């Protein structure tokens, strides 16, 4: 197999195209495939707050592979060994949470690169990513198809944003609204005017630096606002929240005293 690796999600980011995504927290390949047939540009398979194992992530990657929706994997942390596993099962785009400094960003880049450019362990012959050794010259071409996104979601990270943006190998920065608002002293209140101001200025700084800017907005008006500020990969919902809301709304049609979806906090 002499296939060239490609990453449509990364290619579209390079062109500055807007991509609309969906957060997957349900942990099942069945739900992931349903989402993949809906037409979202990208699907975030969450390993940080959803109880996904490596095998769960693997099965969801398999489920969405036949479709145009591009998978993005968020591991639970920036662990070098965990990043190695996630890459080996075939993830091409990673979203790394809680990156606060340029040094941390450089460590993440190193974890995704094979020597001599980094510290990723070599195991292509047993990895789905290399089709079990059948993709010729996998190690030589993989860096071009790898897309690395980091999350800025604390006051410390905001203080180091410019330095993080200067790190070679970082393709985009994602603003984490829930953790960021808590870090700024406004827990569960990402809609606070000061938080909104900081989100706007951060998105504009990211784009001015030539990087992609991402966001998760469960409220449609907030998603539209982030797009207007320049964000170019925006998730507009979470599968478990959408499912929960739909269940509540359907029940409210038939049971008195039910008034639709429950109030949900920030995510």
From Swiss-Prot:
EC number: 4.1.2.53
Disulfide bonds: none
Active site: 49
Keywords from the UniProt entry: Lyase, Magnesium, Metal-binding
Record's cofactor remark: Binds 1 Mg(2+) ion per subunit.
Catalytic activity reported: 2-dehydro-3-deoxy-L-rhamnonate = (S)-lactaldehyde + pyruvate
Cofactor(s) the protein requires to work: Mg(2+)
Enzyme class: lyase
Residue numbers marked as site, Increases basicity of active site His: 88
Site (Transition state stabilizer): 74
Family: Belongs to the HpcH/HpaI aldolase family. KDR aldolase subfamily.
Subunit-level organization: Homohexamer.
Protein name: 2-keto-3-deoxy-L-rhamnonate aldolase
Lineage of the organism: Bacteria, Pseudomonadati, Pseudomonadota, Gammaproteobacteria, Enterobacterales
